Amino acid sequence: MEKGRIVYLNGVTSAGKTSIVEALQARRDVFFYVVANDLFQETIGEDYLKENYWKYLGEVIIMMYHTAKLFSDLGKNVIIDSILVEREGVAPHYERMKEILRDNPLDLVEVYCPLDICRQRNIDRGDRYETQSEEQAKLMSAGIQYSLRVDPKSRLMRTQTTQPLTIFS
């Protein structure tokens, strides 16, 4: 059985990852399931998150990668809507994710948005705090090998990939 493609959308909150997910899921020529930090975080009780946020979030993020791997192993395409941050519970995050998904077709997509725009989006949304994107940017994993970079100015800029990501055309 051919493995499904995994597309990892990596970026700070309010960069536009979920909007990209919605656009991809609206297409009729390719089908993707979605796993996301926000969805998996909801599996953790609030009291546990208050007690030790990164411990429990770290565990569920790793489970999310195993879930994406399962979809791919079953021949299903899947999008990961997340952010690669280096925090206790997941560090070394980027390396752990690569190890879990090493045998699966993986494209890492940097979803870039200027932090001042993210800040304004956070304010407008009201469900994020104003500086959340800046704080996440400081924690992002370094040295990530992206397949593509998506940003609001140039729409799409290829950096490197073994197979073109035609889903973004």
Task: Describe the function of each predicted region.
Residues 2-6, 76:
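Pre-Walker A (Motif I) flank of P-loop NTPase domains
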Residues 9:
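Hydrophobic anchor at the beta1->P-loop junction of P-loop NTPases
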Residues 12:
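P-loop (Walker A) phosphate-binding loop of NTP-binding proteins
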Residues 15, 19-69, 73:
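Conserved substrate/cofactor phosphate-moiety recognition/catalytic segment
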Residues 32-34, 106-110, 151-155:
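Conserved beta-strand scaffold positions in the cores of enzyme catalytic domains, especially
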Residues 56-103:
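Glycine-rich phosphate-binding loop used to anchor ATP phosphates in small-molecule kinases
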Residues 101-121:
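Conserved phosphate-donor/acceptor-positioning beta-strand/loop module used by diverse small-molecule
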Residues 124-168:
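Small-molecule kinase domains that catalyze NTP-dependent phosphoryl transfer to phosphate-bearing small molecules
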